[in-house]
Amino acid sequence: MVFYYKQGKVPEFRHTFDSKDNILKEELFGEESFDGLYSLLYHFGEPTRVKDISREEKKEFDPSDDNITKHRHLVTSKLERKGNFINGRQYLFWNNRIRIGISKPAEKMSAYMRNALAEELLFFHRGKGKLSTIFGWISLFEGDYVYIPKGTTFFLDTSEDAEILFMESFDRIDLPSRYLNRYGQLREGTPYYTRDFRLPILYEITPANRYKKVYVDYDTYYMVEDRDTLIFDVAGWDGYLYPYAINIERMAPIVGKLHQPPPVHENFSGKSFMVGTFLPRPFDFHPRSIPISYYHNNIDTDEFLFYSSGNFMSRKGIEPGSITLHVRGIIHGPQPGAVEASIGAKSTDEKAVMIEAYEPLQLTKTALKIEDKDYMKSWSKE
């Protein structure tokens, strides 16, 4: 994150103790060895107390051998509720750097999770929840983005109607660098501000601290820690690396005299992707503007769109929860009649999540089961 944060009790100086009879156990939680962003956490007990460890194969990730490159439409309302937030993830797209899918938990988690290799970005399409982490807890609501740093031990409790879009990234998930001034502060004119982010509140009592197992995700398998002490035992912490949430209702979409390209809607970025949000907003104000997207060829990216709510004028056959993938090399844009129908429109109420992947995205077997097979033909139909 771009600003310093502190919770609870920490020593006056790093790597020191306040009382010889009650030494807090310091943990450096940091990326890129000792050179990246980090926080210092102070435990009452040793965070290394693992009495046994075992391996479980990860069955959720199911790559397909489909080798057809074309535009796709997936109908995620066809996905049934499944498992919990650990074992019930339904992966849909992947490449060497990211994984994308939907979670519709049918049951509560019964252990903690820690992703050893990937950062996680969640979007709450439906429902609400509570994220409990080693840093504290964050209440979650419909429309929330949730960032969970790689290596974070967490427990996610969700409502029965929760539907969550998730992205796992092997590259760091950042705020776009162009949104920051040279001091690291968010600039004026960005779609959000520092006070829009919700940060963890450290526990006085640890309500989620009832399990001693941690599923450590290594992408294709889990290592399961069986601990002999409770894990949420932090007296305090400070630093620049921690989970956070931000709701799309707090964001201010950028508009212009003429149609604005997708990058103006960017919210998060990484070496191999960017994530943006299309939000309700006034359309362009040139008297002859065409208010929907022009035709374009994604020469260097695959364009993923998750449609959350509202009317998507440029697309036919789309419903809340639909996903489209527009691949590089094949032109896409408004479907027949959409340009003409858009003339005179003054605003849009659409809400959608966009992921631009810089490496081609592949489909899973789960994705093929919910695909609208005729979507590629939709541009040839009047």
Question: Locations of the language-model features?
Answer:
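Jelly-roll (double-stranded beta-helix
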Residues: 1-382
